[in-house]
């Protein structure tokens, strides 16, 4: 049976493709989810993609990942990246390998975006690669899990 990973997207990521396309590009959340599913499958993994604008829902999914023995997490916490100690604590608490990803280069933007509570709970962080960052995140997560690319 294939290992499962969760790809969690936070607030406003449902607006990808229409929200500030000069920063986030024109790809939609559906495009991200398709990319994640295809990339994960290439390593024999199954990606379960979820998005919520609510911090508590994201925390519930992180907790669920532990109870369902999910192998790894990719998270784009959106604006909660810079504010949510609760998300940090949830990630630390479940002890599941996690990669943080952001579509834009948060360090080339406003100062308040330069701090991440998520990064301290993740083994890797990626930003500025557009939606390709998700492919890179899953590739790195697969390597951490010992999953090899399938033919």
From Swiss-Prot:
Database matches in InterPro entries: DHquinase_II, DHquinase_II_CS, DHquinase_II_sf
The portions of this protein that span the membrane are none
Q: What does the record give as the reaction this protein catalyses?
A: 3-dehydroquinate = 3-dehydroshikimate + H2O
Q: Does the keyword Transferase apply?
A: no
Q: Which residues bind substrate?
A: 76, 82, 89, 103-104, 113
Q: Does the keyword Transmembrane apply?
A: no
What does the sequence similarity comment in the record state about its family? Belongs to the type-II 3-dehydroquinase family.
**Record note on quaternary structure:** Homododecamer.
What is the name listed in the Swiss-Prot or TrEMBL entry for this protein? 3-dehydroquinate dehydratase
- What species does this protein belong to? Rhodopseudomonas palustris (strain TIE-1)
What is the name of the gene encoding this protein?
aroQ
């Amino acid at each position: 049976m294939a290992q499962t990973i969760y790809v969690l997207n936070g607030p406003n990521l449902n607006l990808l493709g229409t929200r500030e396309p000069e920063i986030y590009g024109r790809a939609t959340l559906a495009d991200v989810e398709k990319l994640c599913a295809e990339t994960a499958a290439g390593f024999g993994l199954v990606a379960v993609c979820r998005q919520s604008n609510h911090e508590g829902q994201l925390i519930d999914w992180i907790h669920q990942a532990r109870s369902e023995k999910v192998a790894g997490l990719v998270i784009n916490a959106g604006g909660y990246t810079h504010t949510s100690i609760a998300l940090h604590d949830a990630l630390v608490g479940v002890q599941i390998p996690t990669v943080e990803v952001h579509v834009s280069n948060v360090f080339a933007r406003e100062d308040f975006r330069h701090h991440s509570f998520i990064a301290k709970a993740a083994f890797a962080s990626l930003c500025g690669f557009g939606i390709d960052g998700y492919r890179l995140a899953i590739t790195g997560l697969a390597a951490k899990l010992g999953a090899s690319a399938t033919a």
